[in-house]
Amino acid sequence: MGKTVAIANQKGGVGKTTTAVNLAASLGVLEKKVLLVDADPQANSTSALGFDPDEVKLGTYQVLEHECTASEVVVKTNNPNLDLIPAQIDLVAVEIELVDKDRREQMLRLALEEVKNDYDYIFIDCAPSLGLITLNALTAADSVIIPIQCEYFALEGLGKLLNTIKSVQNIHNPNLDIEGLLLTMFDSRLRLSNQVVEEVKTHFSKMVFNTIIQRNVRLSEAPSYGESIIMYDASSNGAQNYLNLAREFLEKNEELEHSA
């Protein structure tokens, strides 16, 4: 049964979508079968993989509303072994529409049960908020990756997110783990970047991925061409960073499987 990983941080601009798309694509290149669920009404993962959100007829909205099964809305991407459940602007209405429903936090988990055996890993790209859609993602997930940019105020809001994760563990999903904190947008020339790395590693030590995602022009360009970095420029630093992250992620998860 595939492992489900949410990628979450209520701060915007920290590299959530970049990580969701490129970690998923890198695992696909490493011959893992991967599904990416776009659970952000901005639909950035959807457009970053070459789909126009305005033309998406079926996606995460219909899955959360249980109007369609997950398998009915899955689309193939041009990346090896990577499928997508796309998002469209309608997703913004889900927060209001689910509010009065029973088990409203469980909708995504229940929907993904159907496809969990079809994939090695399922990633959920969360919105930059702690609303009902993100709550659904955390309830559906086995673990969560938290991207943190190497910039001023990097740790701002992290305490709030960790408290939300704790309350999800207490109420909805006792098995939710923190997969790791991922440092993004690192620039070795900047003293501040190096200070943030030091501070995060001091505070969170073993929770932090060894792989650090560097600032990279090619990585920033790739989404505007509707491509993952691995398809856009496999030799770039950005592609190599995410391949290294994928290998680190696999090493950790395969060790856990062997010890289980």
Regions found by a protein language model. Name each.
Residues 1-260:
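P-loop NTP-binding core
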